[in-house]
Amino acid sequence: MATSGRLLCLCLVLGLIFESLGHPVMGEKRAGENASPSARSLPKRLGNVEAPCGNQTCQFGCCEDDVCRELNCEHVDFPNY
């Protein structure tokens, strides 16, 4: 019984030592690893969203009085695919 107790204590101490050294016992997943492939490729499929506005084109914004607005836009028109 004393041998099994010593072995248990040794395992616990070794576990604490390796944990303090930064060696993880189990690999941790990062946030993006659980996302589906279709969700990861969504920004690539959208591409650049540009809207004509006066003499220029607005990218990721809206056009008000021939000026591109990035903030306080009520809606953004996406092109039809």
Curated annotation (Swiss-Prot):
It is found in: Secreted. Belongs to the teretoxin M (TM) superfamily. Residues 1-21 form the signal peptide. GO terms for cellular component: extracellular region. The keyword Iron does not apply. Contains 3 disulfide bonds. One of its GO terms (molecular function) is toxin activity. Keywords: Cleavage on pair of basic residues, Disulfide bond, Secreted, Signal, Toxin. Residues 22-45 form a propeptide. Its main location: secreted. This is Teretoxin Tsu6.8. Expressed by the venom duct. The cysteine framework is VI/VII (C-C-CC-C-C). Disulfide bonds: none annotated. The keyword Chaperone does not apply.
